[in-house]
Amino acid sequence: RTALAQTAGAADGLAATMRAAAMDVIERRYTDVEFDAVQLAAELHVSRRQLNRYFSGAPRTVQQAILTRRLAAVRGMILTVPHRDLESIARECGFADGGAMRSRFLRSFGIGPAAFRRAAAAAVPVPDAMLLTAEQTARGRPSPAATIAE
């Protein structure tokens, strides 16, 4: 291999390692309303710009990764704690308030959290976009589809 190819391979490996480290921090800190890409970069001891570079080959940006984790937590809580009010779910999942959570949920899934809750309670089929990914299920999180079917 050429020196350039070896350097590119090492850079790809570093980016993958840093993305994995970032995802670990996101998993630990997503419930903190103040947590964002700036704090994530600081915790990883890199600049925000460098963190964005590490995510440039990933399917999501840094901020999208944080939002995706928060929304997955919202879905899970709606399904597992159906009587908890949406405001408290929003705060527990890292959103500043229920309005912010509702708008992000609706924009991401095409259905609001209250409608999602009603669909789950009525055992109405839920669009695939709202189901956990295989990666999330492999980490031991139950599939919302299984919860709805019960």
Named regions from a protein language model:
Residues M18-V62, P82-C93:
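DNA-binding recognition helix and immediately preceding turn/loop
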Residues S56-A65, F109-P113, P125:
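Short, solvent-exposed alpha-helical "recognition" segments
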Residues V81-A119:
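Sequence-specific DNA-binding recognition helix
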Residues I66-G76, A115-Q136:
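Short, basic, alpha-helical segments at the C-terminal edge of helix-turn-helix-like DNA-binding modules
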